[in-house]
Amino acid sequence: MEAANEVVNLFASQATTPSSLDAVTTLETVSTPTFIFPEVSDSQILQLMPATLYSGMNWLRDHLDGFSLLALSGCIFVSVLYLVHIIAFFYSIYRLHHKVEPDPTLPGVSVIKPIVGTDKNLYQNLESFFTSQYHSFELLFCFHSEEDEAIEVVRSLIKKHPNIEAKILFEGEPVGMNPKVNNMMPAYRAARYPLVLISDSAIFMRPDGILDMATTMMSHEKMASVTQIPYCKDRQGFHAAFEQIFFGTSHARLYLVGNFLGVVCSSGMSSMMKKSALDECGGMEKFGEYLAEDYFFAKALTSRGCKAAISTHPALQNSASVTVLSFFNRIGRWIKLRIAMMPHLMVVEPLQDCVTSGLIMAFGLNYLGGYSVYKTFGLHLFYWIVMDFSLMTSMQNGKFNFTPFLFVFIWLFREFTSPFIFIKAVLAPTIVWRNNKFKLSWGGRIRTSKNSQKVPEAVSLSKGAV
């Protein structure tokens, strides 16, 4: 209280000084003013506080019981989610869809494409890489088996584009329980260029996509990981619109805010890294024990002081076999992965969905101030859907190929089914991926289970580069 007394008394006290006659009696004498500070009690200090703050403290003391504190905390939590919407929208405008100019000084890129099976869009997706407008790159296609029907698709493209450096690598290398990492290992070892781009077979690449990612990579000397924010190429049909709306709203919101805050949220469907930086972390083989290898790539790099960022153009998923059921299974698999890697998300993740957060806000305000639950929940839904539509408009950067009515219908359906997807994922923690079943230990490591199918074994690179 001594410091507070000094501040108050500086303005409140009376000062006594020598008379002017005494001050001029001699030029050699300098009079120092003497201040007298009266004592001020704590109660007097409180009286100087703003009345609103003081009354607010009294209200909190008299009215904030346990349930009120819980309701207030819930309302604050949901208010933060409202802010997340705003940050995501404006950050998307700031970061996405910028034009990039060709730069021949950028490093070469080795594109690794792990492939299992085919669909009617595979040819289009793979050819988009053959036609990339980049001065120096190679394409490395990875297959577990020489019997894979997609091999003929790749061979036909290699024949059609003989000027593009491309290879087919078979059967992988057994470095862990993750079949995707095993599949990519020969390509990673054979990569000739400083930058490595891991791209899923269902990704359609814009002509300037590789250029965009390489430009972002070289924008900072410490940059070592660049990903494309997941989105979807325009396709016809309800199922495709369902997937596109999810990746343009709920997923995009968290991905953008995570990157804005510097949180690692890397997606492996289109991820570029500096090979030298990953080698310093132990190379790709070190991550064969993790199922979410993409996340742990970025985590290992950033833990060594490297930077991670998103490029300006989204990753355009273009699978021909998507259905609502397969989408639900995919989202459930991601939930299981996140919970295994970060167990605290088991509590936080379901609360940040639109429906659950709306109920928290509605009942919280009803308890604290008697506001209508229905009106509050309705306003919450309206705000959420308007902000989601605005964000998706920014992600799309053009016209939608579905009607606003379909957007509203799919959005409501997805939001109201989201809690059930989470519950199902928690109750059935085994992950089914391709033809394999996995169980994860805390931290994201793969552990074997009695019902696990055998992960395809791999052989050395000498078995084949075509």
From Swiss-Prot:
It catalyses: an N-acylsphing-4-enine + UDP-alpha-D-glucose = a beta-D-glucosyl-(1<->1')-N-acylsphing-4-enine + UDP + H(+); an N-acyl-15-methylhexadecasphing-4-enine + UDP-alpha-D-glucose = an N-acyl-1-beta-D-glucosyl-15-methylhexadecasphing-4-enine + UDP + H(+). Pathway: Lipid metabolism; sphingolipid metabolism. The keyword Iron does not apply. One of its GO terms (cellular component) is membrane. Its EC number is 2.4.1.80. Its main location: membrane. The chain crosses the membrane at residues 70-90, 354-374, 403-423. A motif (D3) lies at residue 294. A motif (D2) lies at residue 200. Disruption phenotype: Knockdown of cgt-1 alone reduces brood size, while simultaneous knockdown of cgt-3 and cgt-1 results in a larval stage death (L1 lethal) phenotype. Double RNAi-mediated knockdown together with cgt-3 reduces the rate of development and restores the basolateral cell membrane localization of mig-14 in intestinal cells in a sgk-1 ok538 mutant background. GO terms for molecular function: ceramide glucosyltransferase activity. Pfam families: Glyco_transf_21. The D1, D2, D3, (Q/R)XXRW motif is a critical part of the GCS active site, involved in catalysis and UDP-sugar binding. Belongs to the glycosyltransferase 2 family. Catalyzes the first glycosylation step in glycosphingolipid biosynthesis, the transfer of glucose to ceramide to produce glucosylceramides (GlcCer). GlcCer are known to contribute to the physical properties and physiological functions of membranes and may regulate signal transduction. Only branched-chain sphingoid bases like 15-methylhexadecasphing-4-enine are used for generating complex sphingolipids in Caenorhabditis elegans. Together with cgt-3, plays a role in the trafficking of proteins such as mig-14 to the cell membrane in intestinal cells. This is Ceramide glucosyltransferase 1. It comes from Caenorhabditis elegans.
